[in-house]
Every structure is written in C-alpha cells, then in structure tokens.
C-alpha cells in the first residue's frame, strides 16, 4: 500500500519526548531493519517494536 511504502521509506525520527524506547527502522539503502532510540511521542510510521515486525512490514521495499 502507499501508506506502507511511506512508512518503510521514512527516516528514523526520535521525536521530542525522552523515553528512550528501542525501536526498529527500515533502512532502504541497506535493506535492513536497524535499531534506534524512540522518545515515545510523535515520530513516524517507520517505527517497529521488534526487528521481525519491521521485516514483516518492509521486506521488499
């Protein structure tokens, strides 16, 4: 879907909050899901709780 495409191609966004959750972001250059720190608010759709969730959503982009 277009939403999935946009989610999987967006850069990681920590957001303004400071919670520091470990999340995964799909990197279109490396074709891998990579960990990053998520602050807990705002951000974008390219943010997954697990590497597997990220791969399930974004493999093939």
Curated annotation (Swiss-Prot):
Signal sequence range: none
Keywords: Disulfide bond, Protease inhibitor, Secreted, Serine protease inhibitor
PROSITE patterns assigned to the protein according to its UniProt record, in alphabetical order: BPTI_KUNITZ_1, BPTI_KUNITZ_2
A Pfam family assignment: Kunitz_BPTI
GO molecular function: serine-type endopeptidase inhibitor activity
Protein's UniProt keywords contain Disulfide bond: yes
Source superkingdom: Eukaryota
GO biological process: envenomation resulting in negative regulation of voltage-gated potassium channel activity in another organism
Domain BPTI/Kunitz inhibitor: residue ranges: 8-58
InterPro entries in UniProt: Kunitz_BPTI (IPR002223), Kunitz_BPTI_sf (IPR036880), Prtase_inh_Kunz-CS (IPR020901), TFPI/VKTCI-like (IPR050098)
Residues flagged as site, Reactive bond: 18-19
Membrane spanning stretches: none
GO CC annotations on file: extracellular space
Principal localisation: secreted
Disulfide bridges in this chain: 8-58, 17-41, 33-54
Compartment(s) of residence: Secreted
PANTHER family: BPTI_KUNITZ INHIBITOR DOMAIN-CONTAINING PROTEIN, KUNITZ-TYPE PROTEASE INHIBITOR-RELATED
Protein purpose: Inhibitor of trypsin and chymotrypsin.
Protein name per its UniProtKB record: Proteinase inhibitor
